[in-house]
A protein has these predicted regions:
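Hydrophobic transmembrane alpha-helices of multi-pass small-molecule transport proteins
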Residues: 42, 46-49, 69-71, 103-104, ...
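Glycine-/small-residue-enriched transmembrane alpha-helix faces in small-molecule transporters
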Residues: 1-36, 69, 77, 126, ...
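C-terminal transmembrane-helix exit sites in multi-pass transporters
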Residues: 50-54, 97-119, 239-257
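C-terminal-most transmembrane helix of multi-pass membrane proteins
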Residues: 2-3, 42, 235-280
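Juxtamembrane C-cap of transmembrane helices in multi-pass membrane transport proteins
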Residues: 19-32, 76-85, 93, 156-167, ...
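Specific transmembrane alpha-helical segments of multi-pass solute transporters/efflux pumps
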Residues: 53-90, 94, 126-130, 207-225
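Helix-helix packing/entry segments at the starts of transmembrane helices
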Residues: 90-96, 161-178, 211-247
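Hydrophobic alpha-helical transmembrane segments of multi-pass integral membrane proteins
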Residues: 8-12, 34-51, 117-123, 142, ...
Length: 280
């Protein structure tokens, strides 16, 4: 891979992480219900994806549908978690996903875990315990639990989209359609919501840029750089989102030792997998 191409790919992934880092910030900043935010932003995100992939040959399969459901659950859990716990806790716990990918391969494909993988998995679960032990309210614990579930589904997205017979583009489009149907139906039936144009505009912008455009830049960037670079650079979101949360809300992580342990374990796991792939 040419260095200038890889450099551009790295910049695209960094830009993606920058856009992603504002999703939780905007969700927490507006007064709207989290499901309302998810539904409205998904409208714009699906429009961006459909326009960008207008020449895509769509292949509707049960696998694509199930993948869409998993991604939709991931989006919903992530958005709701941001309303119930800190932005830092939410993003760090969601990025536990590589550990769950390892477990999926062990459970569904019977791949034996190497000692390095067991070490990373163990460290992540210890970090999760520390996150929950540091929370004194049921509200924050509920948010942390949703963030973990978001990470489990995020891992499911990677695992299912990697299957060659799957139509990952269709799965992502379906996920946003599901979010629109479920979230806006719930909002219409059960949520008394007062809207104003500033907050609605912010949520719409989030859907266009932070979800829709970010999905496009991530797809292009991954084609132009290595898997290791893409994973590690995308993880800069774990630094950016807490920084914005502190600057805007003076919000701190529930447990910095847990956050450092979690991020360290995930970086180690990504590095180990890349090393194994290079060695064949």
């Amino acid at each position: 891979m040419k260095k200038n191409v890889q450099y551009k790919g790295n910049l695209l992934i960094l830009g993606t992480a920058f856009l992603w880092s504002f999703v939780g910030i905007i969700t927490k900043a507006v007064s709207y219900n989290a499901l309302t935010v998810t539904g409205i932003s998904s409208i714009m995100a699906v429009l961006v994806l459909v326009i960008y992939n207008r020449k895509h040959a769509w292949h509707m399969t049960p696998l694509a549908v199930w993948t869409g459901v998993v991604i939709a659950v991931m989006h919903i859990c992530f958005m709701v978690a941001n309303k119930h716990t800190t932005v830092t806790n939410t993003i760090v716990l969601q990025y536990s996903s590589p550990i769950f990918v390892v477990l999926y391969y062990r459970i569904f494909q019977k791949k034996k875990l190497k000692k390095q993988q067991l070490l990373a998995v163990g460290a992540c679960f210890i970090a999760m315990v520390l996150f929950f032990a540091g929370e004194l309210t049921m509200r924050n614990m509920f948010g942390n639990a949703l963030a973990v579930l978001s990470g489990i589904c995020f891992a499911g997205e990677f695992y299912l989209c990697a299957k060659p017979e799957n139509d990952a583009v269709l799965a992502h489009v379906l996920s946003h359609i599901i979010c629109i149907a479920v979230c806006l139906s719930y909002t219409g039936l059960f949520v008394r919501q007062e809207y104003d144009w500033r907050q609605t505009g912010l949520v719409l912008l989030s859907g266009i840029l932070c979800i829709g455009l970010a999905g496009v830049t991530y797809t292009i960037g991954c084609r132009m750089t290595t898997a290791l670079n893409a994973n590690l650079i995308a993880m800069s979101e774990v630094i950016m989102a807490p920084a914005w949360a502190f600057l805007l809300f003076r919000e701190r992580a529930g447990s910095w030792p847990a956050a450092v342990l979690m991020v360290g374990a995930i970086v180690y796991e990504i590095w180990f997998e890349a090393k194994e792939e290079r060695q064949g």
